[in-house]
Amino acid sequence: MRRTFTPRGAISGFILGAAVMALAGCGSTPPADITLAPQSSPAASTPEKVGDLATERIKWASNKPGCEGDCPRIEIDSVAFPGIPKLTALVDHVLAYMTGTDANRRGPYDTLSEYTQYFWSTARPRDATYFKASVKDTVGDVVSIELHTEQFLTGAAHGIPATQYLNWERSRGRVMSLDEALIPGRRGQYVAALQRAHAKWLEQNPDARRDPAAYGKMWPFQESDNFALTRDGIVVKYDAYSIAPYSHGEPELSIPYADLRGILKPELLPQP
């Protein structure tokens, strides 16, 4: 049986809106800005270097305060950007927003700290939420970030995962959308390249090989704007239950640069 959560496009649209609006800036409650790596909690942050980009790995975890036995739990494994506070704040904001994969559970919060307070007041004994953010790659001016959440609800058969990519342009201080990365008018060619990548992915999918017609009817190709620019091309991520059953996780399709010439803007292609 297929299950449907909030469409990926809804999350992507919010993220771009948040970027346009230029979002600024261990115990029972994480630091007010968990991803800002407060100096008062040095053990929770670890400086790291990704290419020429300075980052800090931020970790925090807690059960519900005062709870014994089966307790609600939150774990955060995020990333901060000491030289780009706007990006640090955006990562925090988007991770919190991504808990709205189930529209009925979207609460009045905008940061991880606010989400934590909401979660402690509403969670059932075995509920848990896991947050993870990391740099996927850096390509020239662009920093690609992978944001992931997974929610485990008491009584549910399995977790609800969600993954979102952000492509941050350092020179412009903003998120780059897919349409901004494509040459104007080349959206159709991008979709065709994505379909070819999907066809290659199906060739390696034992369920699809077993009964291609039935699989294609149940799990047809879909477009996606959820992309990350990497040194090998672009990677496109899909939600669970979108183009494959839950057992396949969140499928990922790769389009090499060789298939993106004449589609992706020249300044984003590898230079000879």
Which role fits each region the language model picked out?
Residues 17-20:
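Feature marks proteins synthesized as precursors that undergo proteolytic processing into two chains
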Residues 27-272:
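Compositionally biased intrinsically disordered regions enriched in Thr/Gly
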Residues 22-25:
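C-terminal motif of bacterial Sec signal peptides marking the signal peptidase cleavage site
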Residues 2-15:
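Bacterial N-terminal signal peptides that target proteins for export
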